């Protein structure tokens, strides 16, 4: 079955060459966002597709996943609810066609589903830290509207020497003057900053396994912290299309752990 999945993945890439190219880094679905029929999340060679037959399928090289909902709805869409669950909805019904398992420890909040480098979709949340919210009229967009981005930092990863996350005209930059800055439309238009310019040399920013963001200098002295600590686990920092940087976690569900629905 794994071989057939790889072949299916290659066929999908050939059939949808243009969408895959234009949506190559559409790797995030947030609570309240909508993945419409025949749209997908994608990262490198992996694609998480809300198919026209109402089946949600992850095409990858690591065993894949499917919701097993073929033919159970029409015009199906995928959303992420405020308990960290994916929901498939049919246009002809008010009842969800399929809902992903709920972690017993989850609480209401904002979650994020991320198709990551491991070629699996993992749900993180709830949000435990964020930069200030921007203008509300920029808040939502369907996944098909999101451009190519470099928008995600995972637990244990670091940024330094002007490295950045980016989406649309927003950037979150770990500047070489030791300041972490969120900018819009250019490096001089600062939306938010850590206020740590000049407080260290060769500084770097790291996302820890409790969701803590910390800026340290080259002597490992702490320069700034987000002061939001969750339980031990895997977290993700996402620079969202509305220009807000948000930490979600810990991970509450993944296609990698859902063997019962694997292809």
UniProtKB/Swiss-Prot annotation:
GO terms for MF: D-mannose binding
Gene: LECCVA2
GO annotation terms (biological process): response to other organism
Keyword Transmembrane: no
Name of the featured protein: Mannose-specific lectin 2
Oligomer status and interactors: Heterotetramer of 2 domain 1 and 2 domain 2 chains arranged as a dimer of domain 1/domain 2 heterodimers.
Keywords: Disulfide bond, Hemagglutinin, Lectin, Mannose-binding, Repeat, Signal
Residues of the signal peptide: 1-24
Functional description taken from the UniProt entry: Mannose-specific lectin. Has weak agglutinating activity towards trypsin-treated erythrocytes from rabbit but not from human.
Transmembrane segments: none
Bulb-type lectin domain boundaries: 26-136, 150-260
Positions of disulphide bridges: 54-76, 178-203
């Amino acid at each position: 079955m794994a071989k057939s999945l790889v072949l299916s993945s290659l066929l999908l890439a050939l059939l949808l060459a243009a969408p895959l190219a234009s949506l190559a880094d559409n790797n995030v679905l947030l609570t309240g966002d909508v993945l419409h029929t025949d749209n997908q999340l994608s990262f490198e060679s992996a694609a998480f597709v809300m198919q026209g037959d109402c089946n949600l399928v992850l095409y990858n090289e690591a065993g894949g996943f499917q919701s097993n909902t073929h033919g159970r709805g029409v015009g199906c869409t995928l959303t992420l609810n405020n308990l960290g669950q994916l929901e498939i909805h049919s246009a002809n019904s008010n009842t969800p066609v399929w809902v992903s398992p709920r972690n017993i420890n989850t609480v209401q909040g904002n979650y994020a589903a991320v198709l990551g480098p491991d070629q699996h979709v993992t749900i993180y949340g709830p949000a435990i830290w964020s930069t200030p919210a921007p203008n509300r009229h920029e808040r939502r967009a369907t996944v098909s509207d999101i451009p190519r981005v470099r928008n995600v930092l995972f637990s244990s990863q670091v940024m330094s020497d002007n490295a950045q996350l980016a989406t649309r005209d927003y950037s979150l930059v770990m500047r070489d003057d030791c300041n972490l800055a969120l900018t819009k439309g250019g490096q001089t238009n600062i939306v938010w900053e850590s206020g740590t310019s000049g407080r260290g040399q060769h500084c770097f920013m790291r996302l820890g396994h409790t969701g803590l963001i910390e800026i340290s200098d080259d002597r490992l002295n702490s320069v700034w912290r987000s002061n939001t600590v969750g339980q031990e686990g895997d977290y993700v920092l996402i620079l969202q299309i509305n220009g807000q940087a948000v930490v979600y976690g810990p991970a509450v569900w993944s296609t990698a752990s859902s063997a019962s629905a694997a292809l």
